[in-house]
Every structure is written in C-alpha cells, then in structure tokens.
C-alpha cells in the first residue's frame, strides 16, 4: 500500500469539496436564484449540489482513514467506485448533449481521486 498516493487522493477530494461547496456553491446558487425556477425546485437543486460536496468530503475522509489505518482498506472500494462512476457520468452526459460538463473539473478530479486511490491500494 502506498500511503502517499492515498493521501494525495484524499487531498484532491478535500480540495474539490472546498471549492465545490464554497466557490461553486455561490456561483451556482446565484444562477439558480436568478432563474425562473419555483422556490421548491431551487431548494432541491441546492440539496443536490451540496450532496455532491458531501460525497467529496466523505471520499477524502475515507481515503485518509485508510491511509492511516490500512486494515480499513475495504472501506475505500465503494468510494473509488463512486468516483469512477461519477467521472463516467460526467463523460457520458458531456458527450450526449451537455458538452459544458467536459470543461468542468469534476470529471478530471473524480478520475484523479479514483486512479490515485486505486494505485495507492495496489
């Protein structure tokens, strides 16, 4: 197990959570508030946005725990799978009519988290 790679993956996830939750959240909610969406739809959109932030935090925390306590290695596999699946979702949606997603960092950061995490485990 390469602890440094797991810690790098955790750092990417934590940095992504901070940027996504704070900076991205302000930009996103500004755009949502200026839209014609119903208040309930705006609220649900905010929950959806911040659930991804929570996923990034949980990813970082889990990978950091595994780096510090290798016996917890099994905890990392669902996190790594979630990051791979998220990256694939970004790519698929980006290629099927939502091209702006390809330009966003989410796909690349999730893929980097998964690759570094996997490499750190094997």
Predicted regions located by residue number:
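Helix-coil boundary and interhelical linker segments in multi-pass alpha-helical membrane proteins
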Residues: 1-10, 62-75, 118-122
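Polytopic alpha-helical membrane-helix bundles and their juxtamembrane interface segments
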Residues: 4-7, 30, 34, 111-115, ...
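Core segments of alpha-helical transmembrane spans in multipass integral membrane proteins
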Residues: 11, 15, 19-27, 40-68, ...
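Perimembrane loop-to-helix junctions flanking transmembrane segments
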Residues: 33-41
